[in-house]
């Protein structure tokens, strides 16, 4: 299915930090008024345990305002993106990841039954909440290989057994091509399983990859083509990734091209996330630039992380949150008037 370059994209905003429904009505109204058609609610393990009815109420408010509800498993099990702590990690150390030296890591291994059960329970709550899309956001292992330390994950007993079943030998301690392929395959298999479980509950899926993940174009296309995947994207957060202003256009354009290529011939729409957190003073205009690059590159769904420039989280707040948020609104407004 060809993607339309320059057409007006769908716009979305991530929303977290508030569980007061009355306050959310004002916040979500602001999001709707700025031209967004969907809102991505974070739903953590704390929400699963303490706020399931509250999440339903929040989502109902957004639906009344015309916002399609997405939910994302915020830091669930330490496997997906987010800053929330994990009850499951604390309660099930035996199910956690191990690095190649045998060290315990603060995240569940996706191969462990504890992780699978946690996802099932989360998806049950997501389906009951009234959400339409589950965003599988930045799936990752707690220790990604780096040359300096030589450490990587996961080499727990479940991963060792899985490797042995296919390779007919022990999982190596040292990183090599075969280990890299196994790690990438493990994450891909996890995402496939999550998408299938979501589909069984009538939920669509959005897959969002880290910018430092695998460059396997074939693997990307296979994930985007999975039944039930409605969006496929990435989080090319340029400031977070250390890119100077002069490199931002090329970096974003390259990412957009890869996402468009991955979704070509599939039912999934390319999705790009715009960084609106940790923006240094003087670089706010890059948000407008980023939205425009994505729009003209054929990204048909553009979302921003997050509402009010993450000002509720001081560790991620920009130098000028109000200016960043105003710039987001200007960038969203520009998509209504500018055509390629």
Regions found by a protein language model. Give the residues of each.
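Aromatic-lined carbohydrate-recognition surfaces of secreted/lumenal glycan-active proteins
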Residues: 7-18, 70-74, 134-139, 175-217, ...
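Substrate-binding cleft of secreted/luminal carbohydrate-active enzymes
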Residues: 131, 236-237, 241-243, 268-339
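Aromatic-lined substrate-binding rim segments of carbohydrate-active enzymes
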Residues: 27-91, 175-199
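Catalytic domains of carbohydrate-active enzymes, especially glycoside hydrolases
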Residues: 17-48, 128-133, 227-232, 293-302
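The substrate-binding groove and active-site-proximal loops of carbohydrate-active enzymes
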Residues: 12-19, 40-49, 101-120, 173-188, ...
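Substrate-binding cleft/loops of secretory-pathway carbohydrate-active enzymes
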Residues: 144, 194-197, 201-248, 278-297
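Aromatic- and acidic-residue-enriched segments that line the glycan-binding/catalytic groove
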Residues: 78-102, 137-171
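Active-site-adjacent "subsite" loops/lids of carbohydrate-active enzymes
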Residues: 68-129, 173, 192
